[in-house]
């Protein structure tokens, strides 16, 4: 193992001892926020320190066995012990490398999911509805909560745009690689000749901003407009100005919300979406800066990238970033995303390990 990695592991082991001492103090719970912070740090450091302890024991075992090589009676035993210790060291080094990978601070957050119809007109809007159902079914399998924040329906029951909030354990970490262009190839219900059409939707997955302090929005930077809500085909049109449009002047980001009959609740929802979009813009700027020095295709999240194709006649779904093709489109559209999500996470981890090797 490289010296830089060993030095980092020594630092983490020392820090765990400090955290243990702080948690053992009689007044440890006097500041409950600090206590929770230390408890989280303890939970993060403990697995690393445990594996590092096993690694150091394997190093000691190797040194002891090597010292026995000069003894003719112990030579065979020592050779077996050396082989065993080296095997353990190799395995533990791999485990420690994964444990040292940088954690995404947003992984444990809830998320805001935006789906927008793109090329393909009404068929694209119908596919946006199919994608919403796919993600909703996946969320239900995880026992997550799904709340529609804003929707703009098309004439045939699809969505020109739909924004939902998904809340649940590590929701963002599971779906963060879904951002990008999703292409569909199928015979539309409106196609009389039976010809296959290609259309596309854009998906954006953004971590939900904290209620307080995560994204600073100055009230003077906001323009707030209210107007009457309008449903598809003129349905459920409110007679009061309950719909809200927020414009963030420094970034030009505009958010509308008209789903609720309460102007106050519409404003609250719009503020959540606005904060998520501002946070997302900041994250993507940081990622673009990082990408200028290292290309990370999986995590780029570029909305213009076509990341996946859903080919209904062939029954296949292909993720172009990792060249993975699965012939179970019906199951995937019904929310069975586990194989895709896990494969993308594994590829991202491999990218991180490669980067760790370059930087060490």
UniProtKB/Swiss-Prot annotation:
Keyword Transport: no
Post-translational modification: Methylated by PrmC. Methylation increases the termination efficiency of RF1.
Modified residues (N5-methylglutamine): 235
Single GO molecular function: translation release factor activity, codon specific
Compartmental location: Cytoplasm
Assigned protein family: Belongs to the prokaryotic/mitochondrial release factor family.
Protein name stated in the entry: Peptide chain release factor 1
Lineage of origin: Bacteria, Pseudomonadati, Pseudomonadota, Betaproteobacteria, Burkholderiales
Name of the gene this protein is made from: prfA
């Amino acid at each position: 193992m490289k010296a830089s990695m060993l030095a980092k592991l020594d630092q983490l082991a020392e820090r765990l001892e400090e955290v243990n001492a702080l948690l053992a103090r009689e007044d440890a719970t006097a500041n409950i926020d600090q206590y929770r912070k230390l408890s989280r740090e303890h939970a993060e450091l403990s697995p690393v320190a445990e594996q590092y302890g096993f690694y150091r024991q394997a190093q000691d075992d190797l040194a002891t066995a090597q010292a026995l090589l000069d003894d003719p009676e112990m030579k065979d035993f020592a050779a077996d012990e050396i082989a065993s210790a080296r095997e353990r060291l190799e395995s533990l080094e791999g485990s420690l490398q994964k444990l040292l990978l940088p954690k995404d601070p947003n992984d444990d957050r809830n998320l805001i999911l935006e789906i927008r119809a793109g090329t393909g007109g009404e068929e694209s809007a119908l596919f946006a509805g199919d994608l919403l159902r796919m993600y909703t079914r996946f969320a239900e399998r995880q026992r997550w909560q799904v709340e529609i924040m804003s929707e703009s329906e098309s004439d045939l029951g699809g969505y020109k745009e739909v924004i939902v909030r998904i809340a649940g354990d590590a929701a963002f970490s599971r779906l963060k690689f879904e951002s990008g262009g999703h292409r569909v190839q199928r015979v539309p219900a409106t196609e009389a000749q039976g010809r296959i059409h290609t259309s596309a939707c854009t998906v954006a997955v953004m971590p939900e901003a904290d209620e307080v302090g995560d994204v600073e929005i100055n009230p003077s930077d906001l323009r707030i407009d209210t107007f009457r809500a309008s449903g598809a085909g003129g349905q459920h049109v409110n007679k009061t100005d309950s719909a809200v449009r927020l414009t963030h002047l420094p970034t030009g980001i505009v958010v509308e919300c008209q789903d609720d009959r309460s102007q106050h609740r519409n404003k609250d929802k719009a503020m959540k979406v606005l904060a998520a979009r501002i946070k997302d813009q900041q994250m993507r700027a940081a990622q673009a800066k990082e990408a200028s020095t290292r290309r990370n295709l999986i995590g780029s999240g570029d909305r213009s990238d076509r990341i996946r194709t859903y080919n209904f006649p062939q029954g296949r779904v292909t993720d172009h970033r990792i060249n993975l093709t699965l012939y179970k489109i019906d199951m995937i559209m019904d929310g069975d995303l586990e194989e895709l999500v896990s494969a993308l996470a594994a590829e991202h981890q491999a990218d991180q390990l490669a980067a760790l090797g370059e930087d060490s």
